[in-house]
């Protein structure tokens, strides 16, 4: 993009902080200084997800990150993926180093992709892979539409809701691979567990996962 076009876009659509909406001096900076110091950072307390050796996330699922994720998913703010990936890479680059060969994502259904116009977890995975300098590959597909996990209360009901909805997209690409699975949020871990079950069944040797945010224990109910 040439300098004039960049200037014109900034004039017509002035860049704003993705967290509070404050006007920013240029589009290269997506978070204002105040918000940058006021983030709900995850302390890194070990989170056990069945089938995974490690789970990495930079934040708890709290404000202002929560609202930014919702705008990203439901209001077309695809540009947020880059900044989310920068934050995720800063954490995952250390915590998951040497534990994966390829990056993939938790896919949404075709219906959900049509409604939103994109798959938010795919955008995250591709942006994160660029930040980490890693290979990225679609390995799973969601072949059956189900209720939104956010509408279901309780870990057991969430596990039942996702049971059997994923299958391998490219079984040959899974076998003997160490895989980093990306999603936007981890709450009960039911979705990650179901994806992990499919990947391990088809020959994955090690699984780790990463998300933008993770729920506190009292948010998983």
Locate the predicted segments by residue.
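Glycine-rich phosphate/pyrophosphate-handling loop used in enzymes and phosphotransfer proteins
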Residues: 1-221
